[in-house]
Amino acid sequence: MSWQTYVDDHLMCDIDGHRLTAAAIIGHDGSVWAQSSSFPQFKSDEVAAIMKDFDEPGSLAPTGLHLGSTKYMVIQGEPGAVIRGKKGSGGITVKKTSQALIIGIYDEPLTPGQCNMIVERLGDYLLEQGM
């Protein structure tokens, strides 16, 4: 299965008639493996800052998580495994696997819990597959 299929079928899936705003699978080095057409253009230093927070949990809290032109307030996650961010009525979930970052961006009416479930379910599956 291609990485794009994981994005299209698993991350951008339909939940009660709603879906994520954008999603991507990005390598730890910042390379894009696959992304939805709506995924924001991001900078490599933004991915580096996300990776640093997985190694040093809490490092993003003072500055926020930046992706594209959007700043998210970092909220509770799972140190070393999941980073969650909030901005207005939407937010972001980032799940780290051994080789990639699974990223989902949402806005109402999708809930934070639904975004977490979508992103973390795929991330957990990829971890089980050794990825």
From Swiss-Prot:
Domain of life: Eukaryota
InterPro entries: PFN, PFN_euk, PFN_sf, Profilin_CS
CDD domains linked: PROF
MF annotations from Gene Ontology: actin monomer binding
The keyword Cytoplasm is assigned to this record: yes
GO cellular component annotations of the record: cell cortex; cytoskeleton
Localization in the cell: Cytoplasm, Cytoskeleton
Annotated keywords: Actin-binding, Allergen, Cytoplasm, Cytoskeleton
Role: Binds to actin and affects the structure of the cytoskeleton. At high concentrations, profilin prevents the polymerization of actin, whereas it enhances it at low concentrations. By binding to PIP2, it inhibits the formation of IP3 and DG.
Record note on quaternary structure: Occurs in many kinds of cells as a complex with monomeric actin in a 1:1 ratio.
UniProt cross-references to PANTHER family, sorted A to Z: PROFILIN, PROFILIN-3
Family from the record: Belongs to the profilin family.
Protein name, as recorded: Profilin-4
